[in-house]
Amino acid sequence: SSGPPQPGPMGPMGPRGPPGPPGSSGPQGFTGPPGEPGEPGASGAMGSRGPSGPPGKNGDDGEPGKPGRPGERGAAGPQGARGFSGLDGAKGDAGPAGPKGESGAPGENGVPGVMGARGLPGERGRPGPPGPSGARGNDGNTGPGGPPGPTGPAGPPGFPGGAGVKGETGPAGGRGNEGPQGARGEPGNPGPAGPAGPAGSPGTDGGPGAKGSPGAAGLAGAPGFPGARGPAGAQGAVGAPGPKGNNGDPGASGPKGEPGAKGEPGPAGVQGLSGPSGEEGKRGARGEPGGAGPRGPPGERGAPGARGFPGADGGAGGKGAPGERGATGESGSPGAPGAPGSKGVTGSPGSPGPDGKTGPAGVAGQDGRPGPPGSAGARGQPGVMGFPGPKGPAGESGKPGERGPAGATGPVGAPGKXGDVGAPGPSGVAGPAGEKTGKPGEQGAPGEAGPPGPSGPRGDRGFPGERGAPGLGGPTGARGEPGAAGAPGGLGAPGMQGMPGERGASGLPGAKGERGDAGGKGGDGAPGKDGARGXTGALGVPGPHGAQGEKGEGGAVGVAGPTGPRGAPGERGETGPPGPAGFAGPPGADGQPGAKGETGDSGPKGDAGAPGPGGPVGAAGPQGPAGPTGPKGARGGAGPPGATGFPGPAGRVGPSGPAGAAGPPGPVGPVGKDGARGETGAAGRPGEAGAAGAPGPSGEKGLVGLPGQRGERGFSGLPGPSGEPGKQGPSGPVGERGPPGPSGPPGLSGAPGEAGREGSQGHDGAPGRDGSAGPKGDRGESGMAGPPGPPGAPGAPGAVGPSGKSGDRGETGPAGPAGPSGPAGVRGGPAGAKGDRGEAGEAGDRGHKGHRGFTGMQGLPGPAGAHGERGPAGASGPAGPRGPAGSNGAAGKDGMNGLPGPLGPPGPRGRNGEMGPAGPPGPPGPAGPPGPPGSGFDFVSQPLQEEAPDPFRGGHYRSPDGTQKSPARALLLGGSNDVELRLPLLDLAPMDVGAPDQEFGVEVGPVCFL
């Protein structure tokens, strides 16, 4: 063939020749890409204060303020209309006693008298039946800690503990799963030469240019536009090798030479120093699981978990041995009054006198005999309550009249005045028990406010409230100090290319450029004639990154690299949204015991006991000392598992872990150094524009943007559904004591009892049976902590968590020192065939001890423990609360008349007064919440009963929800005097909608009255 002769196979590599003289400066390169942003500069000085901005828009109306303090007392209103008649006045003072009349027929029992002074002690009664359990006593002092119970089941998951202290470095773990594919690595050392590629098609000859004369080497200027290529000069004679020069500046890349024949593989070079750590690669696919490493040493003991929920009640223990006899209780309350004495002899009735006419009221005369009762007149209108008149003078006592003959039995006279107290009759037999207690009186007025009680126990943690509406913006604050320098901004777009500047001093090496798009392939030029071998050019500038090669098969595991330096802590993240609602915390500790309550009402009257033997009741003995704490009960079963706790706070950043195993080999490295420079070929025609390259890989994730401006306030949402009723709150303080009510009317007289015989003395009764077990006591205070139980078995290993998201790009680390240049490798050919996938490496050595783990989740409750054995008998407890009063003893002797009793309970409510005039309209209230969503209803409005001066607006709603649970949707009544009534009504009097002498009407639609 007429082509140029093919070169023979390449000979072995000769010894390294002496370095040639520095080459001439290469043509000026293109402008490099902009460097990566520099470190943030120091904060500038604080600028002068800017002019005031224009006033902002008016803000939204503020939330309604709290109610103001009560205003001062207003002026007196006009006199109201005449009220209704008042209650009957109090009974006037008693007049002087009249002469003693003849004994009348026994009257009906009078009103029960006030309680007399305490009589002499009665004879001792038989023991009463055991009283009901007393109220719970105050909590005793905390007893000494009991012996440690058995290890309980694991509690519910606690809240995550804080991060523990850094543990010691653990032994190396086994090989982990294959990590995801890393980012492109640094270029590797040149691979062995590939086989020769086919010869390219010859290009068209270019015109030879004229060679310029070499200039003196100046300082490296800023990159200018590329100049035109000069013509080739004549070849000079080869000079003697000069002394070794310093490394010259990198020359421009020469044209691509023809591929040589495939050489023999050279010997492996010496391993270079470790290069600087590359950027963090993207996460590769998940590798196959490695072999299990040896079991590490147990970790440090975890922080104690949160307090578990109380376990289920354990089974009841066996009955304990009977305790010692308790201390003597307080003396019982005095017994009820005895049975009435025997009936006196009936006196002869007096003859009835005639009815006298009502004369003018004179001085009080002598008492006449009682006349027969007149017929009841019609009830008169109640008169106006007059002022009480002055007290009249007492009349003289009349002389006793003569005793008249006994007449026929007249009608029963009015009851006579009480006679003198007779001598005590003999004691009668105990009468039968009276009927059950009377109805309870009406509720008294509230008492005065007692002193505030001690704090109650801490309530359960409430559910978090709904998120409140955003508040109004506050006024602009004063200008703050300049903040620290912000994070570096994102990369700006490159500016237009400037004109070439003057040649500057040699710059520092630039940072690594971004990867360029792959250009289209130009046509191959025609091979030039072999020129004489030129001097070795200076090292070329590193070429741009080649396109990313296909993913190679996983290489063998590399040697672990050194541990990188600890990264700087990240800036504090923005506050996250509120977490989900937590579960109710454990119940708080019991509060201090409350103050002693007021004495309760007396119980119902007990049955009369047989009279016991006499003897005064001894005083109450002193209260015995509190016995020691009883044995600890059996542990209850575990409670249900608690719901998952809140997520714990993020732990602090841990120290860098040991370096991972080496990743798979990176893609094919860039083209190796050029071979000997050939003669300059003729310039080729410009190639046609290549097709557009494939889109480049996604750029790095940008920094988080600043928060947007605050949006305008939205409208209030619809009201949510009613929440579940909250737990009952603690009792409010006792109300202040109300004023005493008016005197009630006297009760009806009781029928006289029959006289009983005196009973004989009874014997002591046998002791009663043991009472049934009392109700379960309230939960005691927590005992002191027992000694720690043995450690539980280690929990099962958790499942492997999902892969985390790729972290943000770390800042560039400092460049490591440059390693020495390796010898130039033989120029490689095209990539060889894909190698087989390597086998999994052997398991690594045992890793160091790992850091302390977080507290584990709370385990499920264990099964209930077995019942404990019956404990020994407890010591005698303190004296129990005072029991109820025993049965009544025999009647004591009549006591003296007692002091007058306290004021009776308030009487029934009087009639309502007439409605006063309407007051002035109140100030407008705060805006109510938005109404419920409308539902279909029809509304009819029509005036009612026009003759009423207060016409009543009526309407009926057809609403299925108008019930006691949702009164807001029921019938609403409103009068023109601004009185609104809301149905369901529980109490509606005619006075609420008009005066007593006015008519009123209400038209009510289909609503539910309860």
From Swiss-Prot:
GO terms for cellular component: collagen trimer; cytoplasm; extracellular matrix; extracellular space. The keyword Plastid does not apply. It comes from the Eukaryota. Residues 58-72, 834-847 have a biased composition (Basic and acidic residues). The keyword RNA-binding does not apply. GO terms for biological process: extracellular matrix organization; skeletal system development. Keywords: Collagen, Extracellular matrix, Secreted. Residues 160-179, 203-212, 311-323, 468-477, 486-495, 519-528, 609-618, 633-642 have a biased composition (Gly residues). Residues 1-969 are annotated as: Disordered. InterPro entries: Collagen, Collagen_superfamily, Fib_collagen_C. Its main location: secreted. It holds the Pfam family Collagen. Residues 25-48, 73-82, 213-268, 300-310, 324-343, 405-448, 559-568, 581-596, 643-662, 679-701, 796-805, 872-900 have a biased composition (Low complexity). It is found in: Secreted, Extracellular space, Extracellular matrix. Residues 1-24, 145-159, 918-933 have a biased composition (Pro residues). One of its GO terms (molecular function) is extracellular matrix structural constituent conferring tensile strength. Residues 982-1010 form the Fibrillar collagen NC1 domain. PANTHER family: COLLAGEN ALPHA, COLLAGEN ALPHA-1(I) CHAIN. Belongs to the fibrillar collagen family. This is Collagen, type I, alpha 1b.
